[in-house]
Amino acid sequence: MSAGPITLKPLEDSQEAAWDAYVLANPRATFFHRAPWRRVIERAFGHRAHFLLAEQGGRVLGVLPMFHVKSLLFGSALVSTAYGVYGGPVADNAEVLALFHERAEAMARELGVDHVEFRAAEGERPGWKRKEGLYATFRREIGPDNEKNLLAIPRKQRAVVRQSLEKGLVGRVDDDIDLNYDMYALSVRNHGTPVFARSFFHALKKEFGQDCEILNIHKDAEAVAGCLTFYFRDEILPYYAGGTPRAREFGAHDFMYWDLIRRGADRGCRVF
């Protein structure tokens, strides 16, 4: 008996659990394919979400998260996933993948966008352009033994970590998003980069809960660095980080990334 036709339809609130269950189970999916991104980006930036769910006989066969991003600087585009480092369609087979590409191209024509951008490592569409050398991915494996994890850090950075421990730096996981945001905003502004709205950080924490962690680094009572980090399966994803002018004095950034590795290993993570 046939399972019926494959259908592509917009994601509804009632289907979010099924969407995320598929994302967690598919090894090609990433944190940036998760369903809550549609609310985060729509509320924080106003970009309309177009999340497509592929089904056959009630079974999820694939997902494609997209946003219609309108910008005076970059024009109009369908992006998967906006404000994320990964995205694009994730599907069980080539047939579903082709349907996603066809629907994205049709939506691009309907919306009149300048281009479609899939931030995907695989699943290229014939005829689409691939941008080489634009992005870089940094990943390393970590193990359950934190002494070995420390020894795996390059010698110079490892020395800074040990010195920061001697200086009394302490990492604290808490819900002080505003403190974390202030350090991020200060660092980004000092580099001449536009600063995201505070509401974006609050939306991330609200939507992703325990999978979005706030780590602030303190020297005594003073916060000197911080990082907003995502957790996905066995992976740690440090995403937005910053520090005060005194961070370098204490080696706070090196300590912060070591503390993230240590905490992630204790949590069962194996990729940093």
What are these regions (language model features)?
Residues 4-57, 64-74, 120-249:
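A conserved beta-strand-loop-helix scaffold within acyl/acetyltransferase catalytic domains
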Residues 50-52, 62, 87, 102:
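N-terminal, well-ordered alpha-helical segments
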